[in-house]
Each structure stands twice: as C-alpha cells, then as structure tokens.
Amino acid sequence: LDPMSPREFAEAMTMSGSKVEGWEIEGEKLDKVVVGQVLSIEKHPDADKLVVCQVDAGGEAPIQIVTGASNLTAGDKVPVALDGSTLVNGTKIKKGKLRGVESCGMMCSLGELGLTAHDFPYAIEDGIFVLQEECELGQDIRSVIGLNDIGVEFEITSNRPDCFSVIGLAREAAATFDKELKLHTPVVKAGHGDCAGLLDVKIEAPDLCPIYSARIVKNVRVKPSPRWLRERLRVMGVRPINNIVDITNYVMLEYGQPMHAFDLRSIDEGKIRVRRAKNGEKITTLDGTNHVLTDNQLVIADAGKPVAIAGVMGGEYSGIVDDTTTIVFESANFLGSSVRITARDQGMRTDASSRYEKGLDPNNCIPALNRACELVELLDAGDVMDGIIMDDHSKAQPRKIPLEADWINRFLDLSLSEEEMRAILSKLGCQFDGDLVIIPTYRPDLVHKADIAEEIARFYGYNKIPSTSIRGGAQGKYSARQKFDQTISRTMLAAGLSEIMTYSFVSPKVYDKILVPADSPLRKSVVISNPLGEDTSIMRTTALPSMLEILQRNYNNRNASAHLFEIAREYIPTAENELPVDCLLYTSPSPRDISGSR
C-alpha cells in the first residue's frame, strides 16, 4: 500500500465495511530510551545493595546511574531511560539522588519496556535487560527491540469467518485501495521419508467433521522462535512459547485455520479417530483442567482415549514438550455449532473455538497444513516427511449466483457497467462462468443477488452513491386500529399512568406463578424453535405475568405508588391463523388491584 497514516487506513477500511475499532503504535509511550553501554561498576558508598555505574548513552559524556541490579558487568549494552524520559506505563524518569549519590537516569528491565522473557528468551525477568542485538550507542531502543509496528484492531462480524485471518483482511484491504493481492503459495520440500504406516486417520462422525488432515515432522528441534516471528505474534496479542507452538498460532492468525500439534509418541497404536465422546470419558487439557465429556461432544482420540477436545483444546498428555522428537500437525474442519456447544458446556472458549464457531472453509485445511510444514523447514525446526494423511468427507463446492447488472443498478440507484462490477468482484476472489458469479468457498455470507449488490456497493464506495428521496405513490397514514391504540395510550398517560413495554417471549413457568390451571387454554402457547434461553422459549398467551414482573421490580425499588399500563399483544394459537389479540392492562398502587380489557 502507499504510505498513509493509521487514521487514513482505518477510515478507508471502515467505509468499505471492515470496521476498525482502533489502532496502537507500538512503543509510542516510550520516549528518550536509548542504547547505553556500562563502562564501569563501583559499590555505592552508603548502600550495600546498590552500585554506581558509569554509562555511555551516546552523548558527549558518560552519565552516572545508581541501580540495585546484580546481573551487570562492564561492557554490557542495556536500555537506558534518560533524564526526562517516559516508560510504557507512563512513568517519568527524572534525575535524582539515591542514598546521597546522583543518578541521571535508569537502566531498564524487560517489564519496564512492556516485554517478557517470551519476547527475548535470552534475557532474565528480574534484572536489567542486557541486549544481545546488533545496535549502536544512543540508538532509540524501539528500533532495536522491534517496538516500531502498528497494530490495527478490527470488529469482525460473525458472518465473515474469512476475516478472522490476516489473509482475509489483506484481501479486503487490497479491494479497498484497488491494489493487487499477492498471496504466497506454501511450498514444502519434505523428502525425509514416507509417513505411510506411521499414522492412521479415520473420521467416525463425518456429520461433525467433514475433513481431517495431518502431516508428520520427525527430528523435531524445540527451541525459541526467531525474533521476527516472536514480534509478529506479540503485535497480534499472542505470547510466544516455542517454535512448534508458535508455528500453529502463526498459521491460525495468517490463514484463520486453527492448528494443533500432537506428540506422536502419545498417539496409542498410531491411530487417530474423530468420534463422539463416551458419556463420562475424561481428559485433562493443556491448561491443566480436568473435563468430563458427554456423548454430544466431539473428540480426537487414539486407540483408547481422547487426546483433544475437537476444535477447542488439546490434551495435556499429547502436548509438545522439550524432548518431543516427532510431531503430528493437525488441520481439520469441525461443525461450528458442535464446537460452540462443546466450548459452552465445558466452559472454555478459546481462539480456536471462536473461529470454528463461525463456520470455516474446509478447503482451507490443506493450504494451512502445508504452510505450517513450510515454516518448520524455514525455521529449521524439524524434518518434514512426505505425504498427507487425510480422511475427507467434505462436499464444499463454490456457490453460483446470477450477475444481474440491470437489477443491481436499479437496486443501488447506480449506472455501473457489468465490466466494472466484474472487476470489483474479481478483487474479492470471485470468478465467472458466463453470467454466473462463482463464489469462493471462504465466503459463506454471499448467497443471494442482494449480497452481490452489497459487495459492489461496499467497494464502489457508499459515499459515492447519490442521495435520493424515497419514491412511491402511497401516502402514509395511521390505520383505524392504530388511532384507537393512540387514543387509549394518551388517555392513560393523561390520567397519570406510565406506559411500559414488555417482551412477548416468556417462560412456561410464568403460568405456574399466576396459578393458571393445568388444563387452561392459556397454557397452549406457540413454542419458539430457536429460543435464546428457557426464559424466552414461548410466546405469551397473557400479558399479566410480564406486567406483574415490572410491578414487582418497582416495589423492590421502593416505588410503591407505581401506576402502570401496557397495550400488549397476546399470542393465542388458532386453527384459523387469526391475528394476535390486543389487550390493555393497568395497575393501581395496590398490587392486588389489576384491571384489563381486550
């Protein structure tokens, strides 16, 4: 992209439909913190636990700094906060005296720079950060330790699972700024033996897992990731762990495809079975939590036991440890609703589950798997074996939608040519078969021609669409029934009552609270097929319980003189499909005095 400010980028992305919530410039709060070199260290004359250091910070003369750190030697290069500097937490550093000796700055630890030992594994947490990076005296510390990136936070809607990835957002940015999107295709050299016979994969619940793929890496060398990878993870809000774990997290962020790595030694008989759990089965996950499973939850199991809760978290027993030598990379697709229920019931929502819940593209599994193995080779983290072990039941095919240019122009009140529309859609990965738009499988939100129109409007520019008055021959007016309701409402308000509005969805238990007989027609309610919860699972046949709930709330808040009324709808199922019944309820200061009419 052409150089631009974060604000310009955010405004353009937001206008094209990818809402930016904010951005953070790394190290923005760090000011006047530079590289210094310890020239000498002497004991403090009046404090046994303090030392006095002469430090060359790139200025005309060395500066004197008093510190209690014990991990310094002459010649060490360290971050130095000069007089008048600011740390990441907002702390101001000023010249002062410590036990009578002048100190003209402060040498910084990892924490004072907003870092941890995960960011720089060679450093220690509880001492001064001794730099091993190539740097010059007086150089701004932000450029030395990589605190010079900009992190942009997007608000991603649930219908755009493809945007839970860097590639997805890059595609949006390329279309927004009219640039070509150049995507890298993973290349795996492999050549370290055939994996045939080492692992057997079988999906026993294809309705919950359409595809499961795996690759094997031997001679694994578990070690810290290189700095560039640690920095990219950090700016994305992910803590670096080791090269293998970092690779799985990096691929998830880049491709939006959750990954997992098993220690092959822990896979009993070399068998992986994707199946429903058995009632009462137990597993301890990577966070050390014990879980009891039920038969509506999907697991990854070996010949005898679960080794992971599918789409949520791996098991502790099969995790990567320092002496791991052979690993299995997993890249699979799990049914979003199944993962959501499992994560909810087990009380553990993870980065992986939050992505699976949205519904991922099965065709993304293999590219992500190959990308992970490519990174293994790039980081010299192991030897990738030939072959992909896979069980594939997926039937994901691109959807085709007619491109009706005339209808889209009328719908948007535009006059774009069909070529202009095709150019916009092509930037989003769409292809064409005559007059049909071939929708990529990573865009499950594009279903109808109106969705195509929306994409064209987004990238043509909502601000370019001319404002026009709504045209129509009908004249709006209130119906007789609406006028009657308004008269009733105004009359009640004039009498000093307050109008309330309550939900039409209630719980079946409300009939018990108002002592409705078991055989009463009022209990024959319309049931909601997809309720938010038990409290909103049916349509009310009487507004009285809702009214009483509001009245009780007022009494609980010491409003004993509540005068309330509601013009409400009651939903009585009938064979003739009649319209719902309107009713009016009002209360006096006494909760026993409730009147109404229909």
Q: Model segments located where?
A:
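Conserved mixed alpha/beta core segments that line enzyme active sites in large multi-domain catalysts
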Residues: 37-64, 248-317
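Glycine/proline-enriched, intrinsically flexible loops and inter-domain linkers
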Residues: 11, 51, 177, 181-281
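Phosphate-backbone binding interfaces of nucleic-acid-interacting proteins
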Residues: 1-193, 328, 344-347, 351, ...
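Mobile "lid/hinge" segments at catalytic clefts and subdomain interfaces of large enzymes
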Residues: 105, 304-396
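Single conserved hydrophobic/aromatic residue that forms the stacking wall/gate
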Residues: 586-597
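Terminal amphipathic helices with adjacent charged low-complexity linkers/tails
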Residues: 177, 181-199, 382-407
